[in-house]
Curated annotation (Swiss-Prot):
GO molecular function annotations of the record: single-stranded DNA binding
Function of the protein: Plays an important role in DNA replication, recombination and repair. Binds to ssDNA and to an array of partner proteins to recruit them to their sites of action during DNA metabolism.
Keywords: DNA damage, DNA recombination, DNA repair, DNA replication, DNA-binding
SSB domain ranges (all copies): 6-111
CDD domains registered for this protein in UniProt: SSB_OBF
Quaternary data: Homotetramer.
PROSITE patterns membership: SSB (PS50935)
A Gene Ontology cellular-component term: nucleoid
Gene source species: Buchnera aphidicola subsp. Schizaphis graminum (strain Sg)
Domain of life according to the entry: Bacteria
Name of this protein: Single-stranded DNA-binding protein
Pfam families reported for this sequence: SSB
Length: 162
C-alpha cells in the first residue's frame, strides 16, 4: 500500500486572544484563534535562561468551533490536533499574501486543558462532523506514598520467557 503522506499537527499552548467566531452562509461556525507555544533553554555561553514563543494560527470548524467560542478565552490552555494548510489571497494593494494555519476539522481534536484544580474536556469529530468522544478527566492531586524496596528481596529469574 503506497502512502500519500501524513499531515498531522499536535500543539499544546495558550490562547493569545478570545476566539473569533463567525458563521458561514450555510450556518456552520468557524473560529479563528492564535495559540502560543514556548520552549525554554539555558544559553551555553551566558548561563542565562532563554525563552522562544511561537504563534500558531488555528481554524476550527463546525461543532468544535461552537464549543471553542463558548468555553475558550484568552489565556486558556488547549491541546489541538489538526492538519497544516497554507492558503493564498490578494491584499487590498493586489499583492499575493500567504498564511499557514492549523485546520481542525473532521477527525481533528480540541482538548480544553485547565489548571491543576480544574477538569479537562476532550472533543473529537468524526467524518459526519458529529462529536464521537467527550470525556471528563478528573485530576487527582493527592500525593502518592512510595515505598522503598530492598533489592535483595527481588527475585530475578535468569531465564528469558521466550
Amino acid at each position: 500500500m503506497a502512502s500519500r503522506g501524513v499531515n498531522k499537527v499536535i500543539l499544546i499552548g495558550h490562547l493569545g486572544q478570545d476566539p473569533e467566531v463567525r458563521y458561514m452562509p450555510n450556518g456552520n461556525a468557524v473560529v479563528n484563534m492564535t495559540l502560543a507555544t514556548s520552549e525554554n533553554w539555558k544559553d551555553k555561553n551566558t548561563g542565562e535562561n532563554k525563552e522562544k514563543t511561537e504563534w500558531h494560527r488555528i481554524v476550527l470548524f463546525g461543532k468544535l468551533a461552537e464549543i471553542a467560542g463558548e468555553y475558550l478565552r484568552k489565556g486558556s490552555q488547549v491541546y489541538i490536533e489538526g492538519s497544516l494548510q497554507t492558503r493564498k489571497w490578494q491584499d487590498q494593494n493586489g499583492l499575493e499574501r500567504y498564511t499557514t494555519e492549523v485546520i481542525v476539522n473532521i477527525g481533528g481534536t480540541m482538548q480544553m486543558l485547565g489548571n491543576r484544580n480544574s477538569n479537562s474536556h476532550n472533543v473529537t469529530l468524526n467524518e459526519n462532523n458529529n462529536i464521537v468522544k467527550t470525556k471528563k478527566i478528573e485530576i487527582n492531586n493527592s500525593p502518592k506514598k512510595i515505598e522503598k524496596i530492598d533489592s535483595s528481596e527481588i527475585d530475578f529469574d535468569d531465564e528469558i520467557p521466550f
